[in-house]
Amino acid sequence: PMKWLNDWPVIGLDVDGDGKGEPVTEHRKPNVGREYPAQAPQTSDEFTSNKLGLQWQWHANPVANWMRLSQGRLRLHAVPQNSANLWTAPNLLLQKLPARTFTVTTFLDGSHLREGQRSGLLIMGRDYSYIAIDGTRVVRMTSIDAAKGTPETNDASVDLKNRSVFLRVSVNDAACEFSYGGDGKKFERLGELFPMKPGVWIGAKVGLFSIGPGSGYADFEWFRFAPLSQSAQTRALAQ
């Protein structure tokens, strides 16, 4: 919430009296003089517009040639990586988590990625993990204490029959399960559950990326949120 104090906007609630507002998980809807239906920000994206929805945020100031929206798909061009992990990579296309439990699924065509390039689905924070196409494999990579420059570790990998794949992350509170599939119906878990952590002031985010040298790119057909299935919640609680 925001209020005006001495002609200055004060954001959040000052619960401890130190003069600094703090974020809240719930707050009464403000009285704006008329009734409006409750609405939530857009989350899923079919990539049918000629510009990104307002829910998307680049990890740093964007460059126009990082992406292209055309023919109902998002094209992310590979951008060279200059560090041991993605903490300082500017070309991460992310959005804030919409709920405590959810799934995100995307369809990735990686047939135009070149050698040394990687593209996939990411949970970003101080610790991060992702599932991605790397050559003819699907890989799970993780970095713990990424802000300190910790290199990524390869948690798991599996060979692909082709370079188009469905990628999914199922989130239950802080537990994230990454999986992949060939038909969009049956998904195979890859690697262990990842316990997400917020990333300094930005919190934890979910999104897409494409990295590596050269002129390759990855095409994403859509990016869809859905409620977390009961089976996924049960698996997370069992860990």
Where are these regions (language model features)?
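Beta-propeller blade signature
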Residues: 1-5
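Extracellular glycan-recognition regions
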Residues: 8-239
